[in-house]
Regions:
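Auxiliary Fe-S-binding modules of radical SAM enzymes
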Residues: 1-37, 84, 116, 208-300
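N-terminal [4Fe-4S]-dependent radical SAM core
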Residues: 21, 26-81, 85-91
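Mobile, glycine- and charge-enriched loop segments
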Residues: 50, 54-72, 107-122, 171-191, ...
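Core AdoMet radical
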Residues: 67, 71-75, 79, 83-173, ...
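Short, small-residue-enriched loops and turns at beta-alpha junctions
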Residues: 67-70, 97-102, 191-196, 221-226, ...
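Generic structural signal for well-ordered alpha-helices
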Residues: 76-80, 106-110, 132, 171-174, ...
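Conserved C-terminal portion of the radical SAM core fold
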Residues: 93, 142, 168-246, 273-274
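Catalytic cores of alpha/beta
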Residues: 128-137, 193-208, 252-265
Length: 300
């Protein structure tokens, strides 16, 4: 890459940090750059932006995926109690595929979380505004959607959706979640087969329309270059300075680097299924080694 182009890209980064806005072509140019200096400058700018708007605190939240298990009231309540005892004040529950959220079970779980003053986030793949309002009234704090993308063609391919109505209704629901007073967490992936940096740029620019409280960015598969995810995280931070950004989940053992690199790229939240005090202490140690503090529940 010519020096003139590097200087231009640095100007883009300065513009993003100052005005929190970029044009689509500028985002594409930054994503396409293979110069490590550009990644470094992006992460530095995103880190400054995070500290300016969200200070140094990193939030630890509990994440539990039921997978194919059918959740029951007693088991879920034990999980909530275990998370509370570990120090978590927010818990994300991801339901199994096809599970029905219109049952009294989930309203019961939401009520139990509210009684314990824990914030419950439900991860959904199908949205219905009536159900969302009912669950919100039961005590659900927010909703999480792993859309993957906001491009209808790509969405229908990765979710095997046969009708455009599903996609249109999903966007309508997401755009209205904020109005019902619930938090909205949006997840999208980079490196989806058949996509380009132009598609990623479009997803990044679409985010403000959904007014999310939290954004999760991940690689579509382990084979996708982590650099692309780091750049995307940094750009979302620069263009959306007030949003919270979640790093890759820590699901069992500590990963070698990803979530720490993502914190340095602008993420401020770590989701984990780890509840052992010794492992939580290790996660907190690494977060502090990056120059951040941890939410006070884990400073006891």
């Amino acid at each position: 890459m010519k020096m003139k182009n590097i200087i231009t890209l640095r100007d883009y980064i300065q513009q993003a940090e100052k005005s929190h806005s970029l044009e689509r072509k500028q985002i594409i140019d930054l994503l396409d750059s293979n110069n490590p200096e550009i990644l470094h400058q992006l992460c530095l700018a995103a880190g400054r932006c995070r500290r300016r708007w969200l200070f140094h605190e990193t939030q630890l939240v509990c994440f539990f995926d039921f997978g194919e298990e059918a959740p029951d009231a007693d088991g879920t309540e034990r999980l909530i109690l275990k998370a509370e005892n570990a120090g978590f004040s927010k818990i994300i529950l991801k339901r199994k595929q096809g599970d029905d959220f219109q049952t009294a079970l989930w309203q019961h779980i939401a009520n139990r979380c509210r009684q314990r003053r824990m914030q419950l986030i439900l991860s959904l793949d199908k949205f219905n505004l009536t159900d969302i309002n009912r669950l919100k009234d039961s005590g659900v704090y927010g909703f999480r959607c792993e859309a993957g993308t906001f491009n209808e063609r790509i969405y229908r391919r990765i979710h095997k959706s046969k009708t455009s109505g599903n996609f249109s209704y999903l966007l309508k629901c997401l755009e209205n979640i904020h109005d019902c007073g619930a938090d909205l967490t949006i997840g999208f992936a980079v490196g989806i087969p058949g996509t380009t940096t132009s598609d990623i740029a479009s997803d990044i620019l679409y985010l403000p329309q959904l007014r999310p409280h939290n954004v999760e960015i991940c690689r579509f598969s382990p084979e996708v270059d982590e650099t692309l995810a780091l750049k995307s995280i940094a750009l979302v931070r620069l263009l959306n300075p007030r949003v919270t950004l979640t790093a890759s989940p820590v699901l069992c053992n500590l990963p070698e680097a990803p979530f720490l690199e993502q914190l340095l790229a602008g993420a401020d939240t770590v989701a984990t299924s780890v509840m052992l005090p010794s492992m939580l202490s290790e996660i907190c140690f690494h977060i502090k080694a990056c120059g951040f503090t941890v939410n006070r529940d884990f400073e006891k």
